[in-house]
Amino acid sequence: MHHDLVDVLIIEDESELARLHAELVQKHPRLRLAGMAASLAQARQLLHATPPQLVLLDNYLPDGKGVTLMT
């Protein structure tokens, strides 16, 4: 059985936490890191350019609450 990779976008403004999430994603055999964003503005650009299948979303970002991306 063939399984496609799941594209993951990490939205996190704390660089050390973002790096840790990225390492975990890259180590998982079924996940692929699609991108990383440290703000809502960056996240919106990435979401439109390459929509991921999974998002790891920080709710407290420098330019607003992450949950607003879901509306």
What is each PLM-predicted segment?
Residues 1-7:
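Non-catalytic signal-transmission and effector/linker regions of two-component phosphorelay proteins
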Residues 12:
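Conserved acidic carboxylate
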Residues 16:
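Conserved Rossmann-like nucleotide-cofactor binding loop
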Residues 19-23:
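Charged docking surfaces used in two-component/phosphorelay signaling
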Residues 36-54:
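Acidic, metal-coordinating helix/loop segments flanking the phosphotransfer/catalytic sites
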Residues 39, 65-68:
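Acidic catalytic/metal-coordinating carboxylates
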Residues 58-59:
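Active-site residues of response regulator receiver
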Residues 62:
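The feature encodes the CheY-like receiver
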